Amino acid sequence: MNAKENALRIIRFDHPERVVAGPPIHNLCYLGCHHEGFAGGGHDCPVGTRWTDIWGTDWHKELDGVMGFPRGHPLAEVSALAGYRWPDPDDERLLAKLHRLAAEFSPGDRFLAGQHRDTLWEKSYMLVGMENLMQYFHTEPAFVREVLGRIMDFQLGIARHYLRLGVEFVSLGDDLGTQQGPLLSPDIVAEFLLPQYRRLFRLYKEHEVFVGFHCCGNLDAVLDMFLDLGVDVLNPIQVTANNLDKVRERTQGRMALSGAVSTVTLMAGPPERILAEVRERLWQLGRTGGYFCGPDQGLPFPKEHTDALWAAVEEFGRYPLRPPDGR
């Protein structure tokens, strides 16, 4: 079977040939998906760059190898909402990049995939500011609902462009956890975020599109929500924030997991320790499918360590998997 067929079997827990790093995809994205502005910027720019993205959020690239940091928030004040100009998902300046990337796609062993980076929660605090938004959930709930609804209106507009181009897989993402627990209370998530998420999931599920979701941190409070929404692949499954056995138990046969190799291990090494952890994760999470093996964060790891990671997945990721240490 080719790489795409194998990935489908992983997602469906249906006897794949091997564990791989992730679904093979040809990514589509619009101008602004990675925080670009009409005048440039984005995460590939040099350290020290300052720019304004398509939403009016001001950014500063402070560290090499990671995304910039939002430093100015156009909706920090509730009064700013009345005069705020929302980005238009039909703006040809945004879509030119999307159509160029779509024209480069050749059907075969990859999914045509779309991206909705900072789908809802993260986009809202970039617009409003984290501290402000945390207060406004309680003091200005109508304002928060308006902001979240308009963000999702934009995402739905982009989704319709993706669907017209024939996407089979989409990547969504909002970091909802800390190392110890949820970033937001379950009541806040249920009242403010979940209704908006349902709008986007409903559209994609109606078109039988696979949905991947990126959520850093502890997953205990949101895992049932992701299962209910219909997330097909969840990443990055942070080792230091989760009980991996419990996460696998709750998702077995229902949702594939991606990631789960510790950033701490990958940064510190040595290669022998990385190999041992990969073998442990393969057996722990992937015995019956449903697992893509990779880092639990995207950081600039030493090349020797990433080489050791992928070599271990290649060597030990073929089914039937072998238990580590002769178990």
Predicted regions, residues:
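Active-site loop segments of alpha/beta catalytic cores
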Residues: M1-H26, T52, K61, R85-R327
